[in-house]
């Protein structure tokens, strides 16, 4: 029978589990696995929100209106650029979506008219003999 030493948290005494005779007869320690709450507490944030930005020491401080402004680091600059692109796409969508709907309506109406006209055969010109 195999004996497995299992410890849930560091510093707590291990629990000894005895397996069935069919398992290998080797003592195997199980690595420590944190609980969900411990894993969430230790996990780094997936991204930094604009409200929680912590500015790094300024590399090239500049002065605007008599106050020293700190420069953005690379992640802040990338976040700002992505945010500006998102705002630009939102502005374009507000203008272009109605225009495309109107264009789609006009093209659909034109296709319907062409289909109706194509159904009726052309009449031969009146020939007087």
UniProtKB/Swiss-Prot annotation:
Q: Where is this region: Disordered?
A: 1-25
Record localization: Host Golgi apparatus membrane
User: Topology relative to the membrane, per the entry?
Assistant: Single-pass membrane protein
Is-annotated flag, keyword Chloroplast? no
Q: What is its main location?
A: host cell
Give the UniProt entry's GO cellular component terms. Answer: host cell Golgi membrane; membrane
- Residues forming the motif PPXY motif are 44-47
- Keyword set for this entry? Host Golgi apparatus, Host membrane, Membrane, Transmembrane, Transmembrane helix
Which residues are listed as membrane-spanning?
A: 100-120
Subunit note:
Interacts with host ITCH; this interaction probably mediates ITCH degradation.
Q: Which family does it belong to?
A: Belongs to the varicellovirus ORF0 protein family.
Domain remark in the UniProt entry: Late-budding domains (L domains) are short sequence motifs essential for viral particle budding. They recruit proteins of the host ESCRT machinery (Endosomal Sorting Complex Required for Transport) or ESCRT-associated proteins. Contains one L domain: a PPXY motif which is involved in the interaction with ITCH, a member of the NEDD4 family.
The protein depicted here goes by the name: Membrane protein 0
Species, as recorded:
Varicella-zoster virus (strain Dumas)
The lineage, from the top, is: Viruses, Duplodnaviria, Heunggongvirae, Peploviricota, Herviviricetes
């Amino acid at each position: 029978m195999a004996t497995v030493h299992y410890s849930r948290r560091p510093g707590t005494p291990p629990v000894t589990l005895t397996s069935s005779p069919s398992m290998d007869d080797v003592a195997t320690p199980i690595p420590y696995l944190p609980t969900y709450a411990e894993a969430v507490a230790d996990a780094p944030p997936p991204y930094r929100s604009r409200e929680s930005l912590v500015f790094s020491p300024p590399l090239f401080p500049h002065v605007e209106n008599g106050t020293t402004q700190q420069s953005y680091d690379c992640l802040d600059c990338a976040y700002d650029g992505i945010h500006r692109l998102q705002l630009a796409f939102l502005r374009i969508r507000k203008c272009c979506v109605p225009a495309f709907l109107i264009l789609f309506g006009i093209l659909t109406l034109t296709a319907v008219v062409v289909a109706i006209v194509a159904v009726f055969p052309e009449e031969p010109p009146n020939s007087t003999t």
